[in-house]
Amino acid sequence: FRSAREGANVVIAAKSNEPHPKLGGSIHSVADEVIAAGGQALAILLDVRDEVAVQKAMQQAAEHFGGIDILINNAGAIALTNVENTPLKKYDLIQSINHRAVFVCSQAALPYLKKSSNGHILSLSPPINLNPKWLTVFAPYTLSKYGMTLLSIGMAQEFKDYGICVNTLWPETYIATAAVTNNIANDEAVDICRKPDIMADAAFAIISHRETGQHYLDEGVLRGYGVTDFDHYACNPATKDQIQRDFFLD
């Protein structure tokens, strides 16, 4: 929505053709919100595990809007279980939706990004932290997210000569999303969260500049561009000092 307010053309590609009972919304409702915010929108029903469908989606997006400038790898699966308690089916799911999808989507978007004067790939994954605690409590999930970051490191170097910027972005704190309320706590968890707006503002700042090969935290990005007051990002102003630091950050 942050980009939409600047008049951007936005493609919403996901499996949610109908509102999800736990996640809420659909690709169509999000498209309506993008248009209401001032942008143009195209909703595409897509499973990022299907490489043929991804290639078709990229072609459809490029034909509809005349090209692709920015790819945001935002699809994600979460499983907060250790090796002993993670079924293989769940393991395969989180690997395929997280780091494999970054490979598939980035590769499919590459021919179009090479033609752009402002090509960007931004993946939502953390800086790599080898503190054993993150490799113990939920190693399969950690592997999938670190895989996204490692791939981004490689692509930043590989695509440099094409003028394509490749970076990652991760929240410094819990963000009030369904992933938090469904997997970490409950509806009361929003009291220790920030609003998604901070990630949107940070992402917009990243794609508005030409740095590459960086692994950003949302607050750090905004501080780098002069933001000093973060209180308005708190979901509950009364508990702004109790906001929880996110996974993978010591």
Report the location of each language-model feature.
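A short, exposed helix-loop element centered on a Lys and neighboring polar residues
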Residues: 106-107, 153
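C-terminal helical subdomain
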Residues: 168-169, 186-250
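Catalytic loop of short-chain dehydrogenase/reductase
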Residues: 114, 119-161, 172-175
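Active-site loop of short-chain dehydrogenase/reductase
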Residues: 38-40, 67-68, 113-127, 161-165, ...
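Substrate-binding pocket helix/loop in short-chain dehydrogenase/reductase
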Residues: 82-83, 87-92
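Canonical Rossmann dinucleotide-binding motif of NAD(H)/NADP(H)-dependent dehydrogenases/reductases
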Residues: 1-13
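The beta1-alpha1 cofactor-binding region of Rossmann-like NAD(H)/NADP(H)-dependent oxidoreductases
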Residues: 25, 45-58, 88
